[in-house]
A protein has these predicted regions:
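Assembly/interface hotspot detector across virion components, adhesins/toxins, and nucleic-acid enzymes
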Residues: 18-20, 24-25, 79, 94-96, ...
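Selective for proline/serine-rich intrinsically disordered segments
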Residues: 22, 41, 66, 122-123
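Generic low-complexity segments that are intrinsically disordered, proline-rich and/or Lys/Arg-biased
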Residues: 25, 44, 69, 125-126
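Intrinsically disordered, low-complexity regulatory segments enriched in Ser/Thr/Pro
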Residues: 42-105
C-alpha cells in the first residue's frame, strides 16, 4: 500500500466517523484481544499473518483507582488492521457507549472497513 493509498483510506475513515489512533498505547488496564479476521490471537506474536484485522478492548473502569484522571472512563476499543510486511497498520479507536461491550457492533465496524480496503486495494496478500 502506497502513501497515496493510505491517505485515501484515512480520508474514508474520517468521513465515516473513525479516528486514526496511530501507534498503540499500552497501559495496565484490563484488556483482552478479540480476533475478528486473519490468523493469530495476539498481533504482537511472531509469525502472525501479514494481513489481519484484530480488535483490542480495554475496560478502563478497572484502571480508575490507579489514575484519578480516568474518573469518567468506561470501555474503549481499537481495531487494528495489519496491512504490510513492514507492519504498517491503522488503529481505529472509538468509545463504546453505555456500559455495554457490544462485540458484534465492533466486529461489524471492523468488517465494513475490511471490505472497503479489499474493494479498493485488492484482496489480502497470501502468506
Amino acid at each position: 500500500m502506497t502513501w497515496a493509498e493510505l491517505e485515501k483510506v484515512e480520508a474514508y475513515l474520517k468521513e465515516n466517523g473513525y479516528r486514526n489512533g496511530g501507534k498503540p498505547y499500552h497501559c495496565n488496564a484490563d484488556h483482552y484481544w478479540y480476533k475478528a479476521f486473519g490468523k493469530g490471537d495476539n498481533p504482537y506474536e511472531e509469525g502472525r499473518s501479514l494481513w489481519q484485522v484484530f480488535i483490542n478492548v480495554y475496560d478502563w473502569r478497572k484502571f480508575q483507582y490507579r489514575d484519578p484522571n480516568l474518573q469518567d472512563a468506561s470501555i474503549t476499543a481499537s481495531i487494528h488492521i495489519s496491512m504490510t510486511i513492514n507492519e504498517v497498520y491503522i488503529e481505529l479507536n472509538f468509545d463504546l457507549k453505555d456500559d455495554k461491550l457490544d462485540l458484534k457492533a465492533i466486529e461489524d465496524k471492523a468488517y465494513n472497513f475490511w471490505r472497503y480496503v479489499e474493494d479498493n486495494f485488492g484482496a489480502p496478500p497470501k502468506e
